[in-house]
Amino acid sequence: MNALNIAEYTHTLGLQAKTASAQMARAPAAIKNKALLALARLLRQNVDALQGDNARDLERARAAGLAEPMVDRLKLTPKVLETCAQGCEQLAAMPDIIGEIQGMKQQPSGIRVGQMRVPIGVFGMIYESRPNVTIEAASLSIKSGNACILRGGSEAIDSNKALARLVAQALAEAGLPEHGVQLVQTTDRAAVGQLIAMPQYVDVIIPRGGKGLIERISAEAKVPVIKHLDGNCHTYVDDPCDIVMAVQVADNAKTQKYSPCNASEGLLVARGVAAQFLPQIGAVYAAKGVEMRGCPEALAILRAVPGVQLAEATEADWSEEYLAPIISVKVVAGVDEAIAHINRYGSHHTDAILTRDHMHAQQFLRDVDSASVMVNASTRFADGFEYGLGAEIGISTDKFHARGPVGIEGLTSLKWVVLGEGEVRT
């Protein structure tokens, strides 16, 4: 497509989405749930075909020299597809919050005032790699009564098109508008520039991907943006703590999967437990091939661990999202220094403390400036599915409108409802 055709194409998508949004907003819960259950069924029925489409994307990615952690994000394994199907079913089983009125109160004037939860309208989703985001975004759009326009990465175009066809089929089966969920079919980047500059059609943009994508969208968008930025997450091992538990959690937070944004990239260890904890976690990481980039104090302890891969951490390491079997390690004086380090170098995504001290736990929860803060749990739990939200559309590192995993509620807003019996203002 040339520039003119792309502009016409994206405006057509926008107009179609805006038109469909009215019907999506009015759809009864039973109809929306019917579409979600149909989508879950279609995903399970088409696993082999979807993996065939996905294989073409994987082949192109490897031929283009894409790093293996990025290739991993492209994979539509049977497990990934089953998780998507379960997410659709979980959403269908959840109460429909659209139209709920909350906080209704009688005022001295006689009127009653409350707020009704309503869909945002139309959201645009721009994302890289993970094709399962197509299903997560589509299913949340359906449940929340919104229309959406999805623009996935060029590296996953075949997978995204195949998934979008199943979404369209599910919408049709339920009697919902075919344009309720639309995928941008071109890989031309000019389409992104058009999509983020159509406030007459699109109410909010949700970018999900690398820092470059997020910064570009934030700078150029002419509509509000809900950002899903870096995942430089930390696990802090406190003094006192349960060492056995701390080793298990720190292991899971880093190695359960390297590519997600909620994997821990930094390990902070209180000086009082460092000599006991670091050799044990070092042995675990050594067995799994994880490189530990440490401060001098951490390295002095870790050098005694057989087979461990060590490097001296640089200033850049404290801010790095590795998405790989690498973790930064720093010994700190205690909870105060850990919190200061996280707030300075972290990405305000998810951070955890492993501790037996209730006051330290409360201080950490209060003072760490992140979307999710955890006590004695793996950062890998920072996920809409694990939080009981069904699917998630992303994990917002913003502070306004939505923060943390963005589920149904994050795709809605509140409007004021006033009920009277002829009252007039005096």
Curated annotation (Swiss-Prot):
One of its GO terms (cellular component) is cytoplasm. SUPFAM superfamilies: ALDH-like. CDD domains: ALDH_F18-19_ProA-GPR. GO terms for molecular function: glutamate-5-semialdehyde dehydrogenase activity; NADP binding. It comes from the Bacteria. InterPro entries: Ald_DH/histidinol_DH, Ald_DH_C, Ald_DH_N, Aldehyde_DH_dom, G-glutamylP_reductase_CS, Glu-5-SA_DH, GPR_dom. It catalyses: L-glutamate 5-semialdehyde + phosphate + NADP(+) = L-glutamyl 5-phosphate + NADPH + H(+). It is found in: Cytoplasm. GO terms for biological process: L-proline biosynthetic process. NCBIfam families: PRK00197.1, proA. Catalyzes the NADPH-dependent reduction of L-glutamate 5-phosphate into L-glutamate 5-semialdehyde and phosphate. The product spontaneously undergoes cyclization to form 1-pyrroline-5-carboxylate. This is Gamma-glutamyl phosphate reductase. The gene is proA.
